[in-house]
């Protein structure tokens, strides 16, 4: 796995960034391995968490970006370029999950240890809900493949 992605999770943990990994990386942990050009992060949108994110960004090597504390994160628009052409896409809301609090999603998140780092991924049920709401061709394919692997229509 790309070291910069590991560093994201490592420094998010170290700086107490409240986040959930969603998108393609979450799809992969539920069994459907596909390539993805970005790492999608759902961020709890509080002042304290944004300060923690800013501090983590410095350690990751993305720089000290003061505007992190006030900027609007727009899915697929507000992203940060990582090494090897990967992008870090940060969002503060997820289509299809508007009726769920961040805490509810965090409490139901799947935690996977990767290189001794606890990494938080959106739980399977809510991943499927978000994928259905996004309804892009790749999301439809993800749902089909995940359902085959997990033998259910969740």
Task: Identify the residue ranges that each predicted region occupies.
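Compositionally biased terminal segments of proteins
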Residues: 1-154
């Amino acid at each position: 796995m790309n070291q910069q992605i590991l560093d994201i999770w490592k420094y998010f943990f170290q700086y107490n960034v409240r986040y959930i990994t969603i998108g393609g990386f979450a799809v992969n942990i539920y069994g459907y391995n596909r390539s993805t050009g970005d790492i999608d992060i759902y961020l709890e949108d509080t002042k304290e968490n944004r300060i923690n994110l800013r501090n983590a960004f410095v350690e990751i090597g993305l720089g000290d970006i003061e505007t992190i504390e006030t900027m609007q994160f727009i899915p697929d628009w507000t992203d940060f370029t990582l090494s090897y052409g990967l992008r870090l896409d940060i969002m503060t809301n997820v289509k299809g999950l508007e009726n769920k609090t961040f805490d509810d999603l965090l409490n139901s998140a799947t935690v996977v240890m990767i290189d001794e780092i606890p990494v938080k991924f959106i739980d399977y049920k809510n991943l499927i809900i978000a994928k259905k709401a996004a309804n892009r061709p790749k999301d439809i394919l993800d749902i089909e493949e995940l359902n085959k692997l997990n033998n259910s229509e969740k």
